[in-house]
Amino acid sequence: MSQVRSPFVVVMGHVDVGKTLLLDKIRGTSVAYREPGMITQHIGMSFVPWSAVEKFAGPLVDRLRLRGRIWIPGFLFIDTPGHAAFSNLRKRGGSVADLAILVVDITSGLEEQGVESLKLIQSRGVPFVIAANKLDRIYGWKSVENRPFLFAVEDQEWHAVATLEERIGKLIEELSRHGIDADRYDRVRDFSKQVPIVPTSAVTGEGIADLLLVLAGVSQRFIPRERLQVREGPAKGVVMEVKEERGLGVVADVILYDGTLRKGDVLVTASLEGPKEARVRMLIMPKPLEEMRDPEDKFMAVEEVKAAAGVRVVADGLEGVVAGSPLIAVWDPREIPNACNLVKEEISEIRIESDKEGVIVRADTFGTLESIVLFLRQQGVPVRKADVGPPTHKDVVEAVLSRRKNPIYGVILAFNVKTPPEVEKEAMSSGIKIIAGEILYRIFDEYIKWSQEVRTKTIEQILSQLTRPGKIQILPGFVFRRSDPAIVGVKVLAGTIKPGVTLVKDGREVGRIMQIQKTGRAINEAAAGDEVAISIHGDVIVGRQIKEGDILYVYVPDDQARQWLFQYRQYLREDELKALEEYLKSRRK
């Protein structure tokens, strides 16, 4: 037998857009309108029952004709906003998160981390709603505590509504540049094609009712009922955080999305070494609010916890467990090997170790590692190795090997991890770049900028080893010496000439340029249009092998000619390309 759980909701967005305040306001709604004795608190998340939403948003529920039509029990809001929590809410083939709220500052639009959040939500295929927050900052807006937006907008002066429309219009434009078709939620005709924008104020509570009702509508429209069904049996979940608790030792904050977790259960989860077993000693949940007499006494031990829930697990063997790891409870000891295999398969899909060319990636959790690798692949950046934890000596070695295949892959991308000083020093001495940071898109942008610089430098080095094509004509009346070396005045008709290049006439080599002079001074090269004097070393006499008015070409070895034509053609000027083609034609005569 199975029951339907509440969908998990994650709040995301740029720093200072009001994510935490919005969550606080939503939680406050739950506390104020909950049924007596109802547990709304979990470890790491908060339950907002639908009954509380109906009470809070009563008139709007009736206006939108939603009363009696919502079958979800409520919402489970993840308490930690941001991309790290969203990334760790991972499971094989997708995300544990069922819904996301992308919070945007209505006064400043879509900002850097907002774009990052948007891309992350899209990459996991999670339905989302946009909260256009800070509605109370619209000039002239008249606020009323907790009023639904649809009622509030009807009570505003025209200039406040005009400003709001302008801000929403700009936001819609910004979103369209990222491939998102969005509109104010009451104007959306097809929720399968458009993303709803709900104007909100986390300060006054305006629009919170609308946001919760739109979330309910989106969840029922886009989340299959089977996804929210919780089965009887051992628990499945994901580790959100692992930490040391005084008096308890290492504990794990876990979100359960299926089954039941009991005291004494064997758990299979993951460390950097692979699958790891642990045995539950204690399960900790927050006390119901009405039982919290003492602020220091917020928690209670329980015998079992049913999904969906957030629970603190005290267990022997949690040392080294990594956030973002899958968690499988085992009731039958014979199932432990099977659970270990499932965990091993799941984390091996995230961790990458190959001999292919690509960058090295390091991240703080399995969840963020998976998100980064997914994003890099979408951007066409191959990954040679990806793992959890700080960069190591082995990573530097791998980056050096990868660089041999392609210089732009001689790099380590480190997300939210600190590089040990000795590894940093080794990377520097090996010429390996480490790009570190806490914002994925900044790391990526820095990598793209660096790789372009490396590509340019590499091409410059290659081109400097190639002989550039050139075409010259011996100027009549400017023979200064006939031989040993011959010194003549020439005009560069196309391309470039430099000391050291060999000259060719009618496909035959006639000698090598020793020196180039212009107005009595030695120069390193002469380009098309220049008239210069050159000395030619070799078995050449002016009047025999070469004559005044002759056309000579710079000798370009066959392999280099092929490189110019098929690999580096775009780096030749038009006159150089023409000179090369004429030279090759003269060789075929």
From Swiss-Prot:
PROSITE patterns documented for this protein: G_TR_2
| Binding positions for GTP per the UniProt entry | 13-20, 79-83, 133-136
Q: Where is this region: G2?
A: 38-42
Q: Name one GO biological process term.
A: translational initiation
tr-type G domain residues are 4-225
Q: Where is this region: G3?
A: 79-82
Q: Does the keyword Manganese apply?
A: no
Name of a matching Pfam family: GTP_EFTU
G1: annotated segments = 13-20
Region G5: which residues? 201-203
Q: Gene Ontology terms, cellular component aspect?
A: cytoplasm
MF terms from GO for this chain are: GTP binding; GTPase activity; translation initiation factor activity
Task: Please verify whether the record's keywords include Aminoacyl-tRNA synthetase.
Answer: no
The record's section on InterPro entries has: EFTU-type, P-loop_NTPase, Small_GTP-bd, T_Tr_GTP-bd_dom, TF_aIF-2_arc, TIF_IF2, TIF_IF2_dom3, TIF_IF2_dom3_sf
Q: Its family?
A: Belongs to the TRAFAC class translation factor GTPase superfamily. Classic translation factor GTPase family. IF-2 subfamily.
What is the purpose of this protein? Function in general translation initiation by promoting the binding of the formylmethionine-tRNA to ribosomes. Seems to function along with eIF-2.
The identity of this protein, by name, is Probable translation initiation factor IF-2
Species of provenance: Pyrobaculum aerophilum (strain ATCC 51768 / DSM 7523 / JCM 9630 / CIP 104966 / NBRC 100827 / IM2)
